[in-house]
């Protein structure tokens, strides 16, 4: 495929050809957010190597700077320096905190700022973020004594936060969401008494790993690590953080490499945290030819290189506890399902309806336009693969993961496609289009 930018908001995608080479995906988005945030509330200096220099982490950095944290320039390939202000050092900003398009930023900030007694904050973001539900964070925080006001009884930004001294206790999260869990863990750091957070299913655990590294008194227990207990009173201290490559970004190359005729790719330095490797388990279920090479550990996170070769894929069925471990990879798995002979089914994935877009609806709409055979359900998709996809006019509908998933679909289609909203990829993978152009043969 060749990629031709026809305007700032669209590109021409030409199908055909092979895919080979080595690629290093950007730093993990989830870890990048947390490294910035935990560094800002620690004492001393935190250095971050490999931080994702994309729009979402930039939103987190901007909010923290507005409250008094000193964060150095964020550029590709440069170590970022964060001078922490301590657990209670963040100050009232002079303006609304703009979280951009980042659900992680606004939800983690809610947990942190709700516990800043005597200070007041207003959090907002772009039009997409203002449509995303926030009560999943606000309601459990309210049980701890938080005061959060917003549209639709606090479910939609802008949100006004009046900082309080929060109470510890046993708090259940309404959904298996690392964002919700992390917000509660941040609130628990300065609560009155210990807090135990209980999830309905195990979500990604980057916050638990990193908070312990920074010095928090945090214990993980219960079935599959679903009970997390935080005892307040411990200071956090600056750390040297190395951010591995984002497996959610690697997923696009894994699927493309598994499907493009003759393809062989190596994706280097990918984070292999077991709460994030659901995509590898499903691809193995599909009999994709994937090897994990050079396994090692960096800053408490398992890392490795992934080699993928093209081969025939079998249909798959996913549901239940694996969904939180691959929730961001469902769009690219929907593309993969279109090229399997047989029926694939995704259920228990209603969480995708409240992402940057309604990803179930958007992927159904866009892939159907290419000729895919898809039934959309309340909580998932049924996809009958084996039909030839045709190049056509496509639209990311402002969603970064949709944009990159459709690029892979276009690579495998018959005929060219035009993608509107290609710039959305910059939210998590600023160099995606450059890497695609380089790897195409």
From Swiss-Prot:
It is found in: Cytoplasm. CDD domains: EPSP_synthase. Pathway: Metabolic intermediate biosynthesis; chorismate biosynthesis; chorismate from D-erythrose 4-phosphate and phosphoenolpyruvate: step 6/7. 3-phosphoshikimate binds at residues 29-30, 34, 177, 179, 328, 355. SUPFAM superfamilies: EPT/RTPC-like. Its EC number is 2.5.1.19. InterPro entries: Enolpyruvate_Tfrase_dom (IPR001986), Enolpyruvate_Tfrase_sf (IPR036968), EPSP_synthase (IPR006264), EPSP_synthase_CS (IPR023193), RNA3'P_cycl/enolpyr_Trfase_a/b (IPR013792). It catalyses: 3-phosphoshikimate + phosphoenolpyruvate = 5-O-(1-carboxyvinyl)-3-phosphoshikimate + phosphate. GO terms for molecular function: 3-phosphoshikimate 1-carboxyvinyltransferase activity. The keyword Cytoplasm applies. Phosphoenolpyruvate binds at residues 29, 103, 132, 179, 359, 401. One of its GO terms (biological process) is aromatic amino acid family biosynthetic process. It is an enzyme of class 2 (transferase). One of its GO terms (cellular component) is cytoplasm. Pfam families: EPSP_synthase. Keywords: Amino-acid biosynthesis, Aromatic amino acid biosynthesis, Cytoplasm, Transferase. The keyword Transmembrane helix does not apply. The active site is at residue 328. PANTHER family: AROM/DEHYDROQUINATE SYNTHASE, PENTAFUNCTIONAL AROM POLYPEPTIDE. Belongs to the EPSP synthase family. Catalyzes the transfer of the enolpyruvyl moiety of phosphoenolpyruvate (PEP) to the 5-hydroxyl of shikimate-3-phosphate (S3P) to produce enolpyruvyl shikimate-3-phosphate and inorganic phosphate. Monomer. This is 3-phosphoshikimate 1-carboxyvinyltransferase. It comes from Prochlorococcus marinus (strain MIT 9313).
